[in-house]
């Protein structure tokens, strides 16, 4: 299912770069969520081709293609919201994240163990490590902290602005991702949220067999 999620996220990113923001000053990240995809398979009948009907069946809800702007700090909060603790185990719900994004994550330390919380994170500077530890301390519900966030190979600082491309449901905090609600400059396109994938598949023939690698590696 995550392979399709990454594909949809890449399509969302390309659509916003085509219809809304054609510049290169701000990085653009695409997101998709499992709650907006009705099946983990894009080629539902396995014939090696993806039809308009299959895309429309995959994405049949009444959402719009949408965009907003987040800070790097809020992007990290979104990424952290994929993770939950359940009976002491770390569980992950997969967001579809565009393939131009990389990051690392590590579990927040338990109470009284904050000194060990960042031991496993591969950070380049002590300042970054301290900032990440502060984020764990600031949100007692955080299961992980996010480090080394980069878009298109460029490190993203907490105060950097990032354009987010997704669907109207997710960007309004749907699927229990409230960090998206911190966004500014929210806007919806006059198109259903399936349209970016239609355009993407038309522009990139032969993508039906793509196997995307989920982003986000554990430290």
Predicted segments with their positions:
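Catalytic centers of hydrolytic enzymes
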Residues: 1-122, 128-219
